[in-house]
Structures are given as C-alpha cells and as structure tokens.
Amino acid sequence: GETVAIPANGYVMVFGNDFTSTSWYREPAVGTSVTLTPGLTDSDTSGFPMEEITAMVSGGPRLVENGAICTTLEPGFQEARFTSAVTSRTALGKLADGKLVIVSTGSASIQQLRELMLQLGCVEAVNLDGGGSTALAYQGKLIRSPGRELTTTLQIFTH
C-alpha cells in the first residue's frame, strides 16, 4: 500500500477480511468522506448516537435475545467452531434488572452455552470468544488461564 498522512481530526479506518471479502464492498479512495451509522445488527438501519457510547466490544453469535434462546446464526458465525465445536468459551449476559453476567467455561458447545445463559436468567447474552483466548480473573486472581498470550482483554472494574 501507499503511505498517506493522516490530517488533523482525521481517522484511519481498518477493515478486516470478513468485511472486505463481501460481494458489495468497494474500497474507497484515500480522502473519501464516509458517514458511519453504528448499529447492533445488519437490520439496524437507524443506528444509535456514538456520543452515548463509553465502551463497545464485539462478539458472536448471539446466545439469548429478548429472554429466548437465539438460534439464528448471523453471517460470520456459521463455521463448525460456532455450530458444533465443544471448546472453552466466554460469554456476557444481561439480567432483566440490568445486572451483568460473565461466564467462562472450560468445555461447551454454543447450544450448551445458550441454555446455560438462559438458565442463569439472562434476557440478552452473547458469546465473546473461545478456545485459547478464554480466560477469567476475579479480584486479582486468575480463575481460568488463557491458552495463549492475549493482546486484548475486556476488563470490568467497580468504583
């Protein structure tokens, strides 16, 4: 690629292969103005205001939606590692009262994780990651060690 200076108040946008390999993706020319409308799903065309976002992570597939097991696998989550593999997994869920549920399991299929999150009372839940990146620490103690070094972690603190 070419070297390009980033102007003041400019941004660098990086698109992964999942995005650039789609049939509708067209690489924009350097300097092209773009408008981002962040949404939670492909069908969320109205988006939400970024000013209200303090932190955001991505994951998938969805496990529980509106208090029911979500059996639809979005594009990008149809490989065997999501459909049938049994492996270490990490999930986040939300209870009806807004409390957060964090789960780390040593061995589960996506279906087992869906059922577990529903049994725990989650009205919304998402799979974050699995395999070697599954880890969990609580109050400074490592409860589940990762299978490899991690470059990015989700950390939740109370104050």
Question: Over which residues does each language-model region extend?
Answer:
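Gly/Ser/Thr/Pro-rich low-complexity, intrinsically disordered segments
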Residues: 1-159
